[in-house]
Amino acid sequence: MASRTASGQGVAGVIWPPVVHYLNDLIGWRETYFYFGIFVLVTMVPLALLLRHKPVAASANRQHNAASKHGILGLSPNLVHGILCLATIGCCAAMAMPIVHLVSHATDLGFTSARAAELLSLLFGAAFFSRIAFGMLVDRIGGVRTLLIGSGCQAIMLLVFSVVESQIGFYIAAVLFGLGFDGIMPCYALIIRVLFPVTELGWRIAWQYLFAFFGMALGGWLGGAVFDLTGGYSHAFLVGAGFNMMNLALAGFIFVRQNRQGALRQAA
């Protein structure tokens, strides 16, 4: 359910880039932002009111999952959550590089702005299917394994973006990146759901997404800063791949601890 809900982001990514491109050419980017803000205001506020009812309180026997007096994965619960938050910064800083700068990178290589906008639509179109598929994968192999798969795919495609220059190569890379990156974020909510008590899910998931916003902002800014230093985006994508390695290392640590705790429980 989490992945199906989050897949709406992919649909939006298909619809909005060509619309924004058209409005930018017609009325300018400032006016485009203004009218988009009005659209968000008149649609999101009424839709949010549909969710105003408080959820049914969880029963007492559901308020404890993997958490116990021994901590989580043999560590402090807040330490585990901090590791997940840092992992989120790593993956989001990496994914922001192509999301924010792919259009500029393509136009620098000689693509028209319309073709460059198509790349973003292809990327998010693939992302829609990715979230559905990764949601099914989470149900089969768990959130941490799925996170490792998605993060690994994202790292590979960032390396590809740093070297590809042909139109067909960009189209293929955009689709494959979309298939990899967009299944990552729902994994964190599901990992937290498994590791932490139900009564802590709200604030822990909120913090997780706050760090995701920090990561996206960092990646978007850093991509531009690297461009200013090097005159191109290829090195920015390599920097993004480096952040992705940080994510893989932290997620791998959680995976190893989870397996170790599972083995200890079986031995006991």
What would you call each of these model-derived segments?
Residues 1, 183-196:
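Intracellular juxtamembrane helix-capping segments at the cytosolic ends
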Residues 5, 9-55:
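Helix-loop-helix hairpin linking two adjacent transmembrane segments in secondary transporters
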Residues 79-136:
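Extracytoplasmic gate region of multi-pass secondary transporters
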Residues 130-142, 227-228:
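Helix-to-loop junctions at the C-terminal end of transmembrane segments
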Residues 153-165:
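C-terminal ends and interior cores of transmembrane alpha-helices
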Residues 157, 168-176:
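Paired small-residue
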Residues 195-232, 240:
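A late C-terminal transmembrane helix in Major Facilitator Superfamily
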